[in-house]
Design a protein with these regions (language model features):
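Alpha-solenoid helical repeat scaffolds
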Residues: 1-296
Length: 296
């Protein structure tokens, strides 16, 4: 009781001392759960994991304990262990779509996208009405270069949830990248922006569609708005450079590409999705410099 009071008052060090006395006298589940929560809140994932290993021994058939253990290992970047635990969970509850979904996300974090696709497909077989599963499967397929599969799954997500703004954005952007169905792409982006009018990435997609349609002035206006609503992003600066270059504003295009190049190199480990090629950016910069020199 004293330990619980300390916990509620966020006097965590005192609570830990009391909980350790409790488990020494009578080992059971609740103190270990609360100690793990304290350790996690203090950034001591190693100690939180230790508590959940004790819990797994106390209650080896508890799905909640197994899944939370997997979560902690994932946060501690021990993805192989997290994946193994989630695989065990699928054996315990083979008809639980949420577990297959969690396993797919773990595979994604471990850069095992092929296995992530298979797990996501299993989740969808068990729950074919979940729009987020279709969206995530579509994103995985796009990353693998399967644009047809990506488009099909994004459409399915929208069929289930017409207000799925991210799916509308994704579809519009894929169409723009391929340079086809640009009017349809525009429709999707307008729907996405009705739902999230200040989403910088949606505005970037809209700008890129205008650029592909040959309207660089409209494209520039959207990209400039996009930069207001996002953190510095190398893809947006690359797009900005391309648009400025098309408008023959070579000085500013060079500056935009330099920003993109710098962000790409300095944040290369943090860029999970699309990112510019540094050499391509350098080539663009050199081309713009030559044109600037020719104009003098």
């Amino acid at each position: 009781r004293i330990a619980a009071i300390y916990f509620e008052q966020t006097l965590y060090l005192r609570a830990l001392d009391e909980f350790q006395l409790v488990v020494a006298a009578n080992d059971h589940k609740d103190p270990h759960v609360l100690m793990a929560r304290i350790y996690e809140s203090q950034g001591r994932l190693d100690k939180a994991i230790e508590e959940f290993e004790i819990l797994r021994n106390l209650e080896p058939k508890s799905m909640d304990i197994l899944l939370y253990s997997a979560r902690l290992y994932s946060l501690d970047e021990k993805m192989d262990v997290a994946i193994k635990l989630l695989q065990n969970a699928t054996e315990m509850e083979p008809k639980n779509d949420q577990i297959y979904h969690s396993l797919a996300l773990a595979y994604m974090s471990n850069q095992e996208n092929g296995k992530a696709v298979e797990s996501m497909k299993k989740a969808l077989v068990l729950n074919p009405k979940k729009d987020s599963y279709y969206f995530e499967l579509g994103a995985l397929m796009e990353k693998a270069g399967d644009f047809k599969g990506a488009i099909e799954n994004m459409r399915q997500a929208i069929e289930i949830n017409p207000l799925h703004s991210n799916a509308h954005n994704f579809l519009g952007y894929i169409y723009a990248l391929e340079g086809r169905d640009l009017d349809r792409a525009l429709e999707h982006l307008k729907k996405a922006l009705i739902i999230q009018p200040r989403n910088g990435y949606f505005l970037d997609s809209l700008g890129w569609i205008y650029f592909k349609k040959g309207d660089s002035e409209k494209a520039l206006a959207q990209i400039q708005k996009a930069l207001i609503y996002t953190d510095p992003d190398p893809v947006l600066y690359d797009h900005l450079g391309d648009i400025l270059f098309s408008l023959k504003n070579y000085d500013e295009a060079t500056g935009a590409w330099k920003n993109s190049h710098s962000l790409t190199l300095h944040n290369k480990d943090d860029l999970g999705g699309e990112k510019p090629n540094p050499q391509t950016l350098q080539d663009k910069i050199e081309k713009a410099k030559k044109l600037i020199q020719q104009n003098y």
